[in-house]
Amino acid sequence: MLKIKKPKITARKAGTIGLGVAGYIARWVFILAISYILLYPLFYMISVSVKAPTDFVDTTVIWVPKNFSFHNISKAFKALDYVKSFGNTAMVEIVSALIEVGSCAVTAYGLARFDFKEKKILMFILILTILVPLPMIITPLAVRMRYLDVFGILGLIGEVIGVDIRPNLLNTPWSFYIPSIFAVGLKAGLFTYMYVQFFKGLPKELEEAASIDGAGPLKTFLTIVVPSSGTIFLTVTIFSVIWHWNDTYLSTMFLSKDYPLSVNLARILNADIGSKYDAKTVGIIMAGCLLVILPMLIMYCVLQRQFIKSIDRVGIVG
């Protein structure tokens, strides 16, 4: 009869196994804690948004409402003027974000691939735009949009003819488009820096081959670099769209009508409906927040897999 020897587990092996189990448990506790911190506001927002007015005074109702109701969502939809505000957001913020994605890429390619005397100065200015907070430059920026000029030429002509011919871009989408076109819009410095770091990591052989075949810098960028840089383009696009979508600072400075969703939500929070903040209004406020972030949640859910892959790729190359 064969005797099977039981493997001996030494104290050292037992300690190693114990540390492994403890590390596994600690890792999952940490993940669950972070998930709770991040997801709790969203779950709370959804729960409150679909509660009936009677559920707010019922102490037995915590997460799952006894009476589901779209009353809060309907009220918030009307208060936000959702359809019109969504159109304003798409026309102003989303278009600006997409323009910025392209202009920052072109600017970054020039900084990453070409050497010239002023390159270090431009890189210093680029870093400076990331470090300097927006409130420090918002006043001169708003004045520039009110009296748009090019090296003072229009102002000089206006003084000669006695008529101020400097255009007023406030309350127009152009106050957002023009900074985006010249890669100086919202978070443009950060996006340009991300592009620069990514382009530096791309191999130059294909670009050199295209140059030998007679392709210029722009054609090389469009035919070689852009198809090879889908990951960074996706990353910057998502960040740019989200930052523009959530922006209220520039929108309140440049616009006095036709507000985007983020500004209308802020106005609701600051108005009587927000100042009361009782059981009747908290549901409407949470429903308004849910309606504003819903398009971004849908976008992220659709692009989640590609976004995670792009983040990994950008981290490796950049």
Question: Language-model features: where?
Answer:
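Short, Lys/Arg-rich, polar N-terminal cytosolic tail immediately upstream
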Residues: 1-18
